[in-house]
Amino acid sequence: MILTSNVKLMPGSKVEAVIQISKEFVKAKYNEILKDYSSRLKVKGFRTGRVPFSIIEGKYSDNIRALAIENLIHKSLEEFFESAIYKPLSYAVPKILDEKLEINFDKDFEFTFVYESYPEFEISDISNFKVEIPEVVISDSDIEDELKLLQFENSIIVEDNGSVKVGSIVRVDFVELDDSLNEILATKRQDFVLTVGESDDYYGFGYDIIGMKKDEEKIVEKNYGSDYKFSELANTSKRLKIGVKDIKRRDIPELDDAFAKDVKDSLNTLEDLRDYVRENMLKVVQEKTNSLKLSKLLSGIAEKVNIDVPSSMFEAELKNVINEFSHQNKINITQLQNSSTGLEGVNDVFKENVLNKLKSKLVFQKMVDNDSSEVTELDLENELIKQAQNLKMAPQDVKKFYKERNLFGLLKDEIKRQKVKEKILQDLEEIKLEKVSFRDFVNYKTGE
């Protein structure tokens, strides 16, 4: 139906397109809608389906023309995007630039629109790219720390009839109070669980409830300094009403041969467990090293390439990051968006970090797109077998899961991404830096 289409790239990875549709097609579409009206309209003096077109046009011409224009735009956009060189972002809606569109049967129909597309950029040769990686040292104390974590993971939670202390697992209700000691309902939280001295709660009241007993309630005055971890609370004072509903504690198992056997049946002694822990730590170091190498490579490339990120793509990424932050810190997203940490209140440094990570993702996706290798049936079969082993399921059941949900396309995409990642890491040159401890290395943010 499209007679011609002309496109041009604009700043912000926007594309301006002009679509022209033949006057013959426009007339045919108009007549199609006119006939549909005729088949359904009831006009006094005429049988349904027998109303003359002239009468219908005289009364409903504007409606018919508006429907025709709407239909022409919708269908032509579908056809345009099926073969578009610059693919549109799925979450960005095309914007029609023409203030007023009209049908003239003596002329071809034309309209102009703008949409945001996937950023266009090229990646230069990376064969000489080098990344700096610290040398990781696994000490005896690192192994002991991992054993303590295992003890913690294998502990059980039991009721505690005493008072709240450091390490207590406490379930509380809390709410902010105004100057008249009235509850500010938007801040009310119920059944909030924290571990005193360990949990990073929003208001930072963990140590303020030490000594409280079950069913006890108290009002806490909190003053936040200029360097408080949540900037929206910095230099403010809050009055909180906190009620303790439940107190529990962890029962930690002894570190002995029996514990080693409980962790893994094939382990017989505590020394066997230490060796097992060291092997797992080495695997973690390798995985983290690969993540760090890839992250440094992608960010290094992104710094050298001009990537014009569309505003809607950045906003979508920013919202995802804020939602993830809300989930991790157990903050109500509505409360978060209403505060200064909402999209408008996010500081420039935070936005810049989000933008840089987004550019790294785009660079990696470009490398995947540029890679000519294909995912074979053998690759797919091996991945299904691996997943079946990890999930302790039969391979045919895993295959059935993907087939029923039509997810094989996504699985193939993920397999290719993994293959490209392995190829990049295999060829990437590594420069060793200073020695660091296992814990410091694991806690290092890769930015991936």
From Swiss-Prot:
Top-level taxon of origin: Bacteria
The reaction(s) this protein catalyses: [protein]-peptidylproline (omega=180) = [protein]-peptidylproline (omega=0)
Key words, A-Z: Cell cycle, Cell division, Chaperone, Cytoplasm, Isomerase, Rotamase
First-listed, main subcellular location of the protein, grouped into a coarse class: cytoplasm
Pfam family membership, one: Trigger_N
Example of a GO biological process term: protein folding
Intrachain S-S bonds: none
The PPIase FKBP-type domain, residue ranges: 167-253
Top-tier EC class: isomerase
InterPro entries: PPIase_dom_sf, Trig_fac, Trigger_fac_C, Trigger_fac_C_sf, Trigger_fac_ribosome-bd_bac, Trigger_fac_ribosome-bd_sf, Trigger_fact/SurA_dom_sf
GO cellular component, one term: cytoplasm
Function in brief: Involved in protein export. Acts as a chaperone by maintaining the newly synthesized protein in an open conformation. Functions as a peptidyl-prolyl cis-trans isomerase.
UniProt free text on domains: Consists of 3 domains; the N-terminus binds the ribosome, the middle domain has PPIase activity, while the C-terminus has intrinsic chaperone activity on its own.
Family: Belongs to the FKBP-type PPIase family. Tig subfamily.
Protein name, per record: Trigger factor
Species: Borrelia duttonii (strain Ly)
Lineage: Bacteria, Pseudomonadati, Spirochaetota, Spirochaetia, Spirochaetales
